[in-house]
Design a protein with these regions (language model features):
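Glycine-rich phosphate-binding/hydrolytic loop that grips phosphoryl groups
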Residues: 58, 62, 98, 112-141
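A short helix-loop
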Residues: 1-33, 136-139
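A broad structural signal for alpha-helix termini and local helix breaks/kinks
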Residues: 1-2, 79, 104, 129
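Acidic, glycine/GT-rich loop-and beta-edge segments that sit at the periphery of enzyme/chaperone cores
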Residues: 1-6, 130-175
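Activation-segment/catalytic-loop signature of the eukaryotic protein kinase fold
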Residues: 16-113
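Short, mixed-charge aromatic SLiMs
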Residues: 13-23, 95, 142-154
Length: 175
C-alpha cells in the first residue's frame, strides 16, 4: 500500500520518474537569510493532492540543490571549471547527483570513496606530520577515482527557468 515503507533504491527510482518541480512543487529546506523579518521552518510549497511521497522526495533533493546554487550566486562563488564535488549521503543517490548537475549546470564529481571524512582526516594527519605541504597536495597524492555526472542540457534549461520561481516562493515565505 502507499503507506508502506520503501527502500532507498525504490525511493530514488520512483522520484526519478517524477517531473522536475512537478507542477510548481518546491521544498524549502530552511530559511534564514539577510533581510528576512523572521525565521521559518522547512516547508513544501505548491503541494496538492496529486503529489505523493516520491514527488516530495524529489522536491527535497531539488530544494536543497536550489538553495546551494542560490548561496553560490549570493556569495558570487565561482566553482572550478572541473565542476562540483559531491560527497556524503547525497552522493549515494544517482538521481540526486544528476539533479545537482542539472540545477547547477556544472559537471558533478563523485569520489569513489564512501566516507570522505576519513580520507580528510588522513590527509590532515599527513599535513600535520609534514608528509604533505597542504591538503590539496594530499588529495592529489591519494588520486581518488571519481565518476563524473554531466548536466543534461534540456533539464538544466528547465531548472534555470524554475530557479526564479523557487526564489520568489522562498522570499514570499519570509514576508
Amino acid at each position: 500500500s502507499d503507506g508502506e515503507p520503501v527502500g532507498y533504491e525504490t525511493l530514488n527510482r520512483e522520484a526519478a520518474s517524477r517531473r522536475a518541480a512537478d507542477d510548481g512543487l518546491f521544498f524549502v529546506p530552511f530559511q534564514g537569510y539577510a533581510g528576512q523579518k523572521r525565521f521559518s521552518k522547512a516547508s513544501f510549497i505548491g503541494m496538492d493532492l496529486s503529489h505523493d511521497r516520491f514527488h516530495m522526495a524529489r522536491a527535497i533533493m531539488e530544494g536543497i540543490v536550489f538553495q546551494v546554487v542560490w548561496m553560490m550566486e549570493a556569495f558570487r562563488s565561482k566553482p572550478s571549471s572541473d565542476g562540483l564535488k559531491l560527497a556524503g549521503g547525497a552522493s549515494k543517490s544517482p538521481l540526486w547527483c544528476q539533479i545537482t548537475a542539472d540545477i547547477s549546470g556544472l559537471p558533478v564529481r563523485v569520489p569513489a570513496v564512501a566516507d570522505l571524512a576519513c580520507v580528510g582526516a588522513a590527509i590532515l594527519a599527513g599535513v600535520g606530520t609534514g608528509i604533505y605541504q597542504n591538503a590539496e597536495e594530499g588529495y592529489k597524492h591519494l588520486a581518488i577515482d571519481e565518476r563524473v555526472i554531466m548536466p543534461d542540457p534540456e533539464r538544466s534549461a528547465e531548472y534555470r527557468r524554475l530557479l526564479p520561481a523557487y526564489k520568489r516562493s522562498v522570499q514570499a515565505l519570509g514576508d
